[in-house]
Structures are given as C-alpha cells and as structure tokens.
C-alpha cells in the first residue's frame, strides 16, 4: 500500500505543478513535460501494459465464462475495453488535437487528421478495464482500489513521453471510467448477449 500512496502523491503533485504560468488548454493546466520516458516510464513498459491487459481480459473471459461472478466481471471488462476503443478513436478523430511532441501549444485543435492527442486512448483503455472490477469487488475487498495505480502510472508515462497533455489524460480516464461504470451496471454483458453460448460458457468447462 505504500507504493500505491507514492503513486497517488506523485500524480497529485504532477497535476498541481500544472498550474504554472505557462499552462494553458481548456482547463488552464496543460503544459508539455520534459521528455523522460526511460526506466519505469519507458514507452515499452506502457505498451506492455496495454497489450498484456488485452490478452489477460480476453483470455480470462473466454476461459472462465460468464456463469461465475468473476467470469461475468471479466466479460463486462471486455465490453468496456471494446466500447472505449471505439469511443476514443471517434473522439480523437473529431477533436484532432496536436500532441505535445508535435508542438508546444495545447490549444491546437481541429488541425490535421494525424493529430490524435485528445483523449488519451491508452489511459481510457486501462481505466475501462479496471472499473468493472472496482465496482464489483470494492465492498468485499477494498484492496481492489489498488488497480487505480495502473491508469495513474500510464497517465504519467504518456505525459512524460510527450504523448499527451494533462487534460488528455483526465478525459481518457473519465471516458474509460464512465463506460466501465455503465457496463458494470448491466446484468448481462453485451458480449454475452450477442455471442453464442459455446463461446461465453467458458473453455474451462470443456476440460
């Protein structure tokens, strides 16, 4: 839990320092961080988090099936991940915001179709994945809140690699959390309702 506290303190300090004189953007907090994407913050680690989370969520959904509490939560997480990916891509295309690495102006919007800074798709992705688990198990096991470390880590990493502005990260987290909470409230996950029972029943039941 000490590491969790350190991460939370770090992101709070990071956003507090955003209120510098040079900060701008829609909330007045955006500024480009000095590039420092090495070590724990390396781009490879960020991509590993993204890709491994996809494999884990899809794999566990297919293995456990939807008949158990945990299995159903994984399917809700799968739905959240897919819907968030579509929503994030559409939002990026609509707003076309320039990344910090492309220029030092957080107010550059609607410029080029290659500008896709807003919102942070990776932060939205990992937030959408963890939200159903927090919503489902928060009362049974408060330690599930430690999953919040993942989007916090990813958000800091994306800003340190100059891939996103502060408001990109906040918007991504809000998008992922919103979609995750919506899917958490559903009794039957979308995927389970659409896919054949032979897929959603769980491969572990076949062995």
Positions of the model-derived regions?
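Outer-membrane beta-barrel "beta-signal"
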Residues: 196-207
């Amino acid at each position: 839990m000490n590491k969790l506290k350190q991460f939370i303190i770090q992101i709070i300090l990071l956003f507090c320092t955003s209120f510098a004189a040079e900060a701008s953007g829609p909330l007045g907090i955006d500024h480009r961080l000095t590039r420092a994407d090495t070590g724990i913050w390396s781009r490879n680690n960020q991509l590993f988090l993204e890709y491994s989370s996809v494999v884990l969520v899809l794999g566990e959904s297919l293995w456990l099936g939807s008949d158990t509490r945990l299995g159903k939560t994984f399917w809700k997480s799968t739905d959240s991940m897919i819907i968030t990916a579509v929503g994030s891509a559409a939002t990026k295309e609509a707003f076309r915001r320039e990344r910090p690495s492309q220029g030092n102006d957080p107010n550059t919007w609607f410029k080029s179709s290659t500008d896709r800074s807003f919102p942070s798709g990776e932060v939205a992705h990992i937030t959408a994945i963890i939200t159903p688990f927090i919503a489902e198990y928060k009362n049974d096991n408060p330690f599930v809140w430690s999953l919040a470390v993942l989007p916090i880590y990813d958000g800091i990493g994306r800003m340190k690699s100059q891939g996103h502005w502060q408001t990109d990260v906040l918007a991504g987290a809000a998008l992922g959390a919103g979609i995750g909470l919506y899917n958490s409230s559903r009794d039957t996950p979308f995927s389970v309702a659409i896919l054949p029972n032979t897929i959603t029943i769980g491969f572990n039941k076949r062995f």
